[in-house]
Amino acid sequence: MAEGGFDPCECVCSHEHAMRRLINLLRQSQSYCTDTECLRELPGPSSDSGISITVILMAWMVIAMLLFLLRPPNLRGSSLPGKPSSPHSGQDPPAPPVD
C-alpha cells in the first residue's frame, strides 16, 4: 500500500466492483436457466454476425490491389522505352559557367 492508506490500484479494480460484476453475471445467467434445463444460446446479439476477419482482410487486399493498379504514372517504377527516365538522360548536368 502507498502512504496514507491510499491504494491507486483500488481505483482501477476494487474487490467490491469485481464482486458486483460477479453477482450481476450470476443474476443474468439465472434468468436463462431453470431447474431442469439451461439454454445454451443466450438471447442477444449472436456471435455469428455474418462478417468475419477473413472477409475484412480480403476487402483490404482488394482495395490495396486496386490502388496499386490505378496509381498515377509518376509513381510507377518502369518507364516507356523511348522516354528518358530523367531530364538529362542519365548524364550529369552541365557545369555552370565560370566567370
Curated annotation (Swiss-Prot):
Residues 71-99 are cytoplasmic. It comes from Mus musculus. InterPro entries: Uncharacterised_CD034/YQF4. It comes from the Eukaryota. One of its GO terms (biological process) is blastocyst hatching. This is Small integral membrane protein 14. It is a single-pass membrane protein. Ubiquitously expressed. Keywords: Endoplasmic reticulum, Membrane, Transmembrane, Transmembrane helix. The chain crosses the membrane at residues 50-70. Residues 1-49 are lumenal. Residues 77-99 are annotated as: Disordered. It is found in: Endoplasmic reticulum membrane. GO terms for cellular component: endoplasmic reticulum; endoplasmic reticulum membrane.
